Amino acid sequence: HVLTVKDCIADNFLQQIILVPEQHEVIATLNLNGDYISDALAAQVGGIGIAPGANIGKGIAVFEATHGSAESFAGKNRVNPGSIILSGEMMLRYIGWDEAADFVLKGVKGAIQKKQLTFDLARVRAGRKFIRPKSKEKHTAEEIQKELMALVPGATLVSTEGFGDAVIDNM
């Protein structure tokens, strides 16, 4: 294996990693820049709600969601569980359980292809059509479903539990 070290400033690196990601296999950086980089890259594939995370060292590995905790959403059954599900998929692959990992990946892909989406995934699939809410007022599930249908026709808004069930159903 050949390791090429390329030192660059953070703003230029963010541009390069988004424009030519295939030029980078390993990134070593400080925590703050790592947070910016991982969030920017997560946005390219669906956001932090779907991006898995792993910290792998010699003989030890930790797999976790890439986002922090969101105490304000605790117990509300509406946060995208994709990040932790895909972190589990990476863990299964790491320990050599490739067949189980393949089932998890198939389930996540199937749920998204069938448009069984948490609201954050609907925004990503809709692309630039997404309009940010004008206020921070709370919306009913029916209002959110109506907006979801406008963003992604044929989509079904699912809860945390609903997305997990959709993953299982699509395995």
Q: Which residue stretches match the model-derived regions?
A:
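Glycine-rich phosphate/diphosphate-binding loop of Rossmann-like nucleotide-binding domains
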Residues: 1-11
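Active-site nucleophile and cofactor-binding loops and adjacent substrate-binding regions
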Residues: 7, 77-79, 156-157
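Glycine-rich phosphate/nucleotide-binding loop
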Residues: 16-117
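Mobile late-domain/C-terminal helix-loop "cap" segments
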Residues: 84-171
